[in-house]
Regions:
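Active-site- and interface-proximal helix/loop "cap" or "latch" segments in soluble metabolic
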Residues: 23-31, 35-97
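Structured beta-strand/loop patches that form or line metal/cofactor-binding pockets in enzymes
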Residues: 2-37
Length: 97
């Protein structure tokens, strides 16, 4: 099954890897931006979607290892769509590892 997200930018500057992705059209968010620093998630931001919930997700994942997000967020389903904004993040994380 082909992936339904698209990584539009993956750059490294001063040891910080910055990733920008467009999630599946099935979810409400339109873009995911985050940094990876030494295997941890930093500066997670979503454009669009449920603003409060996605801000909370960013705050909860700040400084957490990628494995933390993968273990807890993979497969979360929103409104029977087969994916969610948090699940889309885990799909992108797997792709860039």
């Amino acid at each position: 099954m082909p992936e339904d997200y698209k990584i539009i930018s993956d750059t490294v500057q001063d040891g910080v890897r910055h990733i920008t992705a467009v999630p599946s059209a099935l979810v409400c968010s339109r873009q995911i931006d985050f940094d990876l620093v030494d295997g941890t998630i930093r500066n997670l931001r979503y454009t669009g979607g449920c603003h409060g919930n996605l801000q909370a997700l960013g705050a909860l994942l700040e400084g957490q290892p990628v494995s933390f997000a993968l273990e807890r967020l993979s497969g979360i389903n929103c409104k029977a769509r087969g994916t969610s904004c948090s699940d889309q993040l885990t799909r992108v994380l797997r792709a860039v590892l």
